[in-house]
């Protein structure tokens, strides 16, 4: 079926006996929903398109999608045999998997642009390609390849997934993998930044390049290794190790243990609640004036008689 030179289309592929197996969209904003009994090919062309692959029975999967150029949304409910190309633009791919074919897997390519992958699926392959892409995963044996750009893996989705909730995750960007508390392993290729979970105890290790590593909640251990890294413990009692390079360490709330390592490091505090008094205070173990280390309090309240936080002003600029 070819539909072209129209301002936009909205199409639902029915469950009837006769239906189109190849769909061509327009260069405008199209909405295409699959409800038919057979696999289809979709060529959406340009425009900000919404595409839904929502068969959830034995007829699902094995589709081909070329979303084209534009900021597209592709939602897939059946995992197995799908080849999906998001194309140019800042796209969103959602694997809201309700049914899967255990004998097959999906392959999804992000194309150019800053894409977002929300993955609640199993053992499929995801390629960010060019751009600064973000992968959200529950940790079910997937393969993630960021490609070029500065790319991020996040396991925040575990917080809402009962099978892994509260078990934490181990992420090692230098060795290109992550494992969940249940022992499931995912491959992480060409990914620079990582975010853990809100409820588990996460162990996050960076690589030789600059990384941004976030622990969120729980007792997290974060190690930057090489590069100029940003380490953010979030809430909970965290241990942060900068390694080599000029690193920024933010313990967040809780009793935190901060080790800058070699290089000019900054220990960044943004609220008085981030370090308690007495035995619950944060500990910096290796502050060295010779390395020009800094304790940054510039965003903490300088005048308690005024509401809100007022930054410090230093004599001489």
Model region roles, listed by residue range:
Residues 98-100, 158-182, 269-274:
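Acidic/polar low-complexity surface segments
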Residues 81, 100, 160, 195-201:
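Residues in short coils/turns that link rungs of repeat/solenoid architectures in beta-rich domains
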Residues 37, 60, 69, 79, ...:
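Parallel beta-helix/beta-solenoid
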Residues 38, 58-64, 80, 100-107, ...:
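Surface-exposed loop/turn motifs in large extracellular/passenger domains
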Residues 162-167, 264-317:
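Acidic glycine/aspartate-rich repeat arrays in secreted/surface proteins
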Residues 3-18:
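Short, Lys/Arg-enriched N-terminal segments with co-localized hydrophobic residues
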